[in-house]
Structures are given as structure tokens and as C-alpha cells.
From Swiss-Prot:
A motif (TonB C-terminal box) lies at residues 737-754. The keyword Electron transport does not apply. GO terms for cellular component: cell outer membrane; pore complex. Keywords: Cell outer membrane, Disulfide bond, Ion transport, Iron, Iron transport, Membrane, Porin, Receptor, Signal, TonB box, Transmembrane, Transmembrane beta strand, Transport. Residues 1-24 form the signal peptide. Disulfide bonds join C511-C519. Belongs to the TonB-dependent receptor family. It is a multi-pass membrane protein. This is Probable TonB-dependent siderophore receptor PirA. Pfam families: Plug, TonB_dep_Rec_b-barrel. The lineage of its organism: Bacteria, Pseudomonadati, Pseudomonadota, Gammaproteobacteria, Moraxellales. Residues 54-181 form the TBDR plug domain. Residues 404-414 have a biased composition (Polar residues).
Amino acid sequence: MSKRIIQSVLSVSVLASMMSMAFAAQNEQEQAEQTLEKPAEPVKLETIFVTAEEQVKQSLGVSVITKEDLEKLPVRNDISDYVRRMPGVNLTGNSATGQRGNNRQIDIRGMGPENTLILVDGKPINSRNSVRYGWKGERDTRGDSNWVPAEAIESIEVLRGPAAARYGSGAAGGVVNIITKKVTNETHGSVEFYTSQPEDSKEGSSNRVGFNVSGPLIKDVLSYRLYGNYNKTEADDVDINKSIGSTAAGREGVKNKDISGRLAWQATDQQTVLLDISSSKQGNIYSGDSQLNANAEADAILSQLIGKETNTMYRDSYALTHEGDWSWGKSKLVAQYDKTHNKRLPEGLAGSVEGKINNLDDKATSRLETLRFNGEANIPFEYYLPQVLTVGTEWVEDRFKDNVSTTQGKDSSGSGYGDQLAKGDRSKMESRIASAYIEDNLKVTDSTDVVLGLRFDDHSKSGSNWSPSLNITQKLNDYFTLKGGVAKAYKAPNMYQNAEGYLLSTNGNGCPANIESRCLLQGNGDLKPETSVNKELGIQFQKDIVNASLTWFRNDYKDKIVAGTHVVGTVDGSSTNANTGAVTNTKWNILRWENTPKALIQGFEGSLGLDFGDIRWTNNFTYMMDSKDKQTGNPLSLVPIYTINSIFDYDITDQLDVNFVFTQYGRQKSRQFAENRLESGIGSGGANSALKPSTVKSYSTAGINVGYKFSDQISTRVGVSNLFDKQILRDSNSISQTYNEPGRAYYASLKYSF
């Protein structure tokens, strides 16, 4: 990155800060004068002060989950249980391989979890980046959607397509913004207990307890908020999938511990300072999973680990926020420091044992540190048209150290092929992104709103990127509104893809079909960033009790980063026979991560909501027309061809309510085309190992629950999930049926509020 760019970005940040402070001294006097001389002006200003971000969140590609929604359909542990019910959202892996199938994460519009950005109160979380990135693009992680307990959440915003592009790298599919409960000027709080008990004794149960409390330390000046959570979800039995002849593991368990505090200081009527500190621990309960479905019961090492904690994530976050509400507009400054320690047993890095735990020694720890600064100002004014201008800058720096995943090809003499390909300390990686953005929300007419945006990102290795955007809202009449948008989204290479010291190897089966043996996959510091031109166009109808919409979306995905198929060189290496001690000298073919030309995502989303007051019925659907890597012909991820969600909510009395939920998943087709020698039928397994395309048939799940309020303080809820017991079992011989859908379970919660 050039020094000039860095200096420019930092200069704008400093200037924004100085402007905020300079205007602060004049603010109270100016507001008083405006109130006396022009009393109508503040009211007028308030009515048009809608920022570009707020306006874009009115797009059809945006859904909001409220705290009441989470109370009426409680999640077992992870908010992904509820987010998956939104249009365009599914749970899947980051590729169409089905690897790590039971570690499904939030996928938006088929772009994969790596293109879904998780935010907490608008601040990104990237702890999953500390987990090793596999040959096919998978990580052994549950993602970043489980760092905030449901009890602490005020709402969840799910942004899809063009609406998400403003958030920068990693939001090409969409954004999930978890908004926590605010501090209060009166003491309020709650404690909730939740349990879920499966009918099938081989499935893991779940129990959690959480609390949230907030109140003043100094009335009207200093307030606090504190929340905490403990959850334990047991692992499935190691033999849960044996009934269909599969050795694949079931879902692993998880133990969560979370604590978070906030101090809010109302420094003046115009200025608020927030201090956020949180600490979390997530540990797994091992159930036998490995990247390539090894038989855990037959493996000497894996069989000893069943039921134990093989990986633990520790996450600490510190953030300081200044919010200003001035006579000229609003400002926000954020400084954030996140630290993730990923402690886990070492895994293989070669061929058929990639991703499989290979010893019982002490866990190794990789360390990820992220420093983030963001400054933003929103300025309303009128120049030909009423408008609100947004200007902002951002600086993100990641420093990462992984001593275990960067050891392939290393030997004590320093002459291994890994040592030849990458000199120095291979374990250290880093990344920096400097960004600046400008947006303008224009009120063209009473019925027309236009939001223009332009974002610039400069990455320390992949260079610069410009991301323009346009969103339009046009009211056609009292009932119909046309909404559309187009934006260029962006994703920088991850640190493993960029690191020349990160090597994976295969003796032949994992090589491209045209390479007979011995392939090395090496990180590439010359990768381009991934980009996607995201478009959507839809119509909304609102009248009386009806709210309906239909939206077409299309993502033209370019330069997706994948494992390379072209030999860029060779390197000398050697291997030692463990039985005879004989040394064999070999040559390895070097592949590198590379940008694949194009991919296409396209489909429709629709919704229909009926609100009768005490009765509410909300429905949505997603239909995937296209999901294809144009180079391989395979889908980008494993998602149903269609999904239908329906929630029926009836408040029978002020104390009693009942909820019914139904989801229908369409067929899920696997990859159709081989991508290596083994799948092509020319590897060591011959034709028996050739890729066998498969399909998960359409299926549905349903649930029901009843809630009752004993008083303003005490409430309870009991229910049944997967009411008709449609259980899906993971099949190690299938490349589409790659996950477990749990069967019928009974759950209950008890909440005390004060």
C-alpha cells in the first residue's frame, strides 16, 4: 500500500475528528439561537434526516428479526436457527464438497459463509479467520454467529445483495447485524433458563441460562449494561448415522461462556461515549468429525477423543465509541481491538488426512489480533434537493500467527520443500485495509428516493478496489412501491490464501486430473480481490393487513479465489519410509491459489404477511435459478433449489399465545463434475472412487409452541421442534446428504424480568 494512500485516509480520519470537536463548542449556542429565531426549522430537519444507511435498509433485500420474534421462537443456542428462516438465507458450508457438513454456517443468496459478514452493533467479527482454510475452502468452525446470546439481543438485521455492499470486504453475499439491547436510565433486567431435549436419545440435548441487566450509575449521566450466558449442547452419539450404513460423524457439541459489559456516558446533550468490553469462550465436544469423513471408531486417535474438547476459541473484544449529534449533523467514531486465541489439536495437512486430528499432544494456539478504526459523519443539507451526505473512513489491520498450519514441508535441516518455497518465519501473516466511502441520500420527489454510494478499499497485498452503488425507491401509488439496486461488492483474499508459507500437499488423488502425482498448494501474494456485481429489482404491496413483495436478484461473481489447477513450477523434496528408513527424492508440482474467471448466482425472493392484530401470518420463499461456477460447472455451495418459510402467531389473550412454524426445503443437488483425479476415477481408487452425483429430496419441518405470562415478571414457553420427526442423517457415501437435520425435540423456557 502506498504511503500516500495511507496518509490520505488517516488525514481524512483526523479531519473528521477535529471537525466534530470544533463544532461541539458552538453547538449548544447555535441550537438555542435556531430555536428562538426559527422554531420550525428543527422539526423540518428531523423529518428529512434519513441517512443513506437507514434508507438502504428499506430495500427489499433487508429483513429484521425483533426481540419479540426471538422470544416467541427461541433458538437452541446459535441465532442461525432463526436467521435461516429469512428470505435468501440457508445454512451450508463454504463449498459444494459437503466437507464439515455438520458445521453449517449462515449462507446468503448462495454466496457461501465466507461472503456473509457478521456484525455486532455494526462492528465486524472475524474470529473464524483464525481457523485453517482447507484445500476446498472449508474451515472447521461454527462461524461467528454465536458470540452474542439471544437474551442480549434487541434485533437482528439481515441485509442481502446491494444493501450489504456498503460494509466492505466480506459482505458480497450479505450482512447479519446483531443489535444488542441498549443501556437504560432505570434498572431493568431478566434471567432466562432454556432446555431442549431430543426424542432420539442419540441426539445431543441443549441447556442454557442467560441474564441481562441495565441501569444508571449516575442518573442521566452514566449508565451500564451487563449480560452473560452459559450454554452446553451435547454432541450426537458417534454411531448416530450407522442406521444408513454411514461412518460420518453426527453434530458435535458446544459449550459457550459469554460475559459482556457496556458503560454509556452522556457527556453532554450532544455527545455520548460508549465503552464495550466482552469475553467469550467456545469449546467443542468432539463427535468424531474430520474433513474427509474418516471412521472415528476405527481410528486409534479419533476414537480416544470422542466426547472431549478438541478445539477452543477464546475471544476478547474492546471498543470505544463516540457519538455526536450536532447542529450540522451526526458523527460517529469507533476504535476497536479484537483478540482471538484458537486453541486446538493439530490436524493433517496432506491428502486424505487433511483436516484429521493426527496426535494427542498438547493443543497448539493460533493468535489473531484485529485493530479497527472507523469515522463517519452524516450531514443533512439542501442543494437543489433535500439530501443527507455520508462520509467515512476505515482502517483495519489483522496480525495472525499460526505455528501449526504452516509446517508442511519443513524439516530440522531447513532444506525441506516448504523451507525452499518460503523463507523466514512462515507462521506470521498480516493484512491491512484502508477504506474511504461517500454516500448521498437524495429526496428527488415525495415519491422518489435515490441513494448514491462509492467506496474505496486498498488492501496491503491485493491492491485497490472501487465499489460504486445505486439504490432507488419509487412509490407508484398508495399501495405499490418499486425498489431496486445495483452495487459492486468486494472481498479481499484471506490471510491463508495470501501466505506463501501456507502449504497443503497431496500425493496424487487430490491433484487436478491432468497432473499424475505430487501436488503442492501454496499461498499466493499476487491474488486479485473477489468482486461481485449484485443487482436486485422488486415490487412491494402494502394495504391494510397485507404486506407482500417479490424480488429478482442476480450476482455476477468474478475472480473467486480457489485452489489452482495450473502448475507454476516444481520443487525438490524427499520422503522417508517409516518402516525401512529409505529416503526417496521426489519432485513436487507447485499449484497456487488463483482467481477463477466467473460465477453466477440468480433467483427470486418473495414474502407475504397478513396482520390481523392478534393474529399474524408471515411467509417467505426463495427460489434459486442459478448457482454455478462457470469454470467447473458446479454450484458454489449446497443450498436447496427453493425454500418456503411460514410462521403463524396468535395472541389468544394478553397472557397466552401460540406459534406454529413450517419450513419446506426443495431438492439439494450435489456437484456434477469431477475436480480432481480421485473424483475423475483415475486415482488410486479407480472407477469405484469416481464422483457420484446425488440429490437430497425435498423435505419439510414444522414446530409449535405455547407461551404464557404468569405476571409482568414471570413467563414461560413450551414447544416441540420438528413436530413430524423428519430426521435427516448424514451419509459418508453422499456428496449432497452431508449434514444431520435433528429429529423431534421438546423444549421449554422460563424467564424472570424486573
